[in-house]
Amino acid sequence: FRGQNILGYRPYADDVVDYFVQKSISNGIDIIRIFDCLNDLRNLQEAVNATNKFKAQEGRGEAQVALAYTLGDAYSLEYWTGMAKKIEEMGADSICIKDMAGLLVPYKAAELIKAMKEVTKLPIQLHTHYTSGVASMTYLKAVEAGVDVIDTAMSPFAMGTSQPATEV
């Protein structure tokens, strides 16, 4: 969900975020994937804290911080590895590289995964879309580089703007 914005497009109070996370975990959602479209970790801290609080109470729940992958001069390996370190420090259980536009290409994925694995012990999950037609190869290179989890979709729902097919 969208951190302080939960599932909407405006910020909510900390107690509302806390209650949303509590209800999510108590109703069976184990992985709380939290992101901010601008990768502003301040907007994610309350959700991470809430997940960790209810994980301690319920015995389950994982705070997964998702980084919105994008291109540009500002988004160097140093940027991504710095974010990985901060995510680990803030108490997250795992990291998801969320490539919602399908911009991540195979060899860049391998480079990114290797670099992030060098700076964090957290599991890394990769989520990409087939929009540019290279997602399957991106996943292959990410797996070779040591990514822990990849997101896929069943073939009737896969490809196009979705994820690569699970069966392929």
Tell what function each PLM region has.
Residues F1-V168:
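Catalytic cores and adjacent flexible loops of soluble metabolic enzymes
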